[in-house]
Amino acid sequence: MTISVAVSGASGYAGGEVLRILAGHPDVTIGAITAHSNAGSRLGELQPHLHGLASRILEDTTVENLSGHDVVFLALPHGASAEIAAQLPEGTVVIDAGADHRLEDPAAWEKFYGSAHAGTWPYGLPELPGQREALKGATRIAVPGCYPTSALLALTPGFAANLLEPDDVVIVSASGTSGAGKAAKVNLIGAEVMGSMSPYGVGGGHRHTPEIEQGLSNAAGERVTVSFTPTLAPMSRGILTTATAKVKAGTTAEQLRQAWADAYDDEPFVHLLPEGQWPGTKSVQGSNHAAMQLAFDPHTGRVVVTCVIDNLTKGTAGGAVQSMNIALGLPETAGLNLQGVAP
């Protein structure tokens, strides 16, 4: 079975990561590679690490260039994906790495993104309860945000097992600068980032907040309220999320650990580390893996979970390819046997 795939937004970090993974996928043939302002350029000028694809010329991101493929990956700014996706054939598997189709609540979309809601697609985080079934045979898939991927992996087992209170969830995430994209910004230049960390989107203002609340609320079966603070870290890629929540009365440390073990022991990409071993971002760099650890703080009655992912791989492109595999009935791990990089 050979699948023809087109990738849009190929000049950016997310699009480049999709291509890196697809280049090693045993069942994929890469067709159109498109961009907008960089159309006409050699891919190797913009993504010099993609040696096997370096001579490919970027085409313009149009419906005509993307049509005729089995699968289309859209790695575009929010708003752009919905416009193109609406014009692609229903039989084409369209995988949106942008935000356009993640949120279920139109009011939340309009509040945080300021435009009309384009609708909701199956959510491409297979490790969440029920999501594998939702993705099987899907022709439209919304790739989760990178912060929500780490946050939902961190806390979903506790809410799904009815062990956590819904009203006092605090999540702090540190991300590498690639999460902000390739566009030149003063706060992302080396002199500003090296040796420094800084928060942003503080006070509930980050666009991933409603997405995190949505996922945790679905797992809990009731409204979950989240305080989310993202932080820019002096590294190119990776996310370290520390998430805490109050545990329900009578919940023990053993029950907490068992809930996370039950959720992830059979997962190929999510790893609950042995007790006492805490994860670092370097261990998952360049891979589709997530590593986590948890502890119960009896002084505050809270569970503390730390989860690390690569924001570009498990947090975007790897999760997208994993979801594609499920949708098409391929082995879920196809093309994703990537280990972390050390040192």
UniProtKB/Swiss-Prot annotation:
A Pfam family assignment: Semialdhyde_dhC_1
Subcellular location: Cytoplasm
Keywords carried by this UniProt record: Amino-acid biosynthesis, Arginine biosynthesis, Cytoplasm, NADP, Oxidoreductase
Origin superkingdom: Bacteria
EC main group: oxidoreductase
GO terms for MF: N-acetyl-gamma-glutamyl-phosphate reductase activity; NAD binding; NADP+ binding
EC number: 1.2.1.38
Claim: Oxidoreductase is one of the keywords in the record: yes
GO biological process, one term: L-arginine biosynthetic process
InterPro entries: AGPR_AS, AGPR_type-1, NAD(P)-bd_dom_sf, NAGSA_dehydrogenase, Semialdehyde_DH_NAD-bd
Family: Belongs to the NAGSA dehydrogenase family. Type 1 subfamily.
SMART domains: Semialdhyde_dh (SM00859)
Biological source species: Pseudarthrobacter chlorophenolicus (strain ATCC 700700 / DSM 12829 / CIP 107037 / JCM 12360 / KCTC 9906 / NCIMB 13794 / A6)
Keyword hit for Acetylation: no
Any one GO cellular component localisation term in the record: cytoplasm
Pathway the protein acts in: Amino-acid biosynthesis; L-arginine biosynthesis; N(2)-acetyl-L-ornithine from L-glutamate: step 3/4
Reactions that this protein is recorded to catalyse: N-acetyl-L-glutamate 5-semialdehyde + phosphate + NADP(+) = N-acetyl-L-glutamyl 5-phosphate + NADPH + H(+)
Active site residues of this protein: 146
Name of this protein: N-acetyl-gamma-glutamyl-phosphate reductase
Protein role: Catalyzes the NADPH-dependent reduction of N-acetyl-5-glutamyl phosphate to yield N-acetyl-L-glutamate 5-semialdehyde.
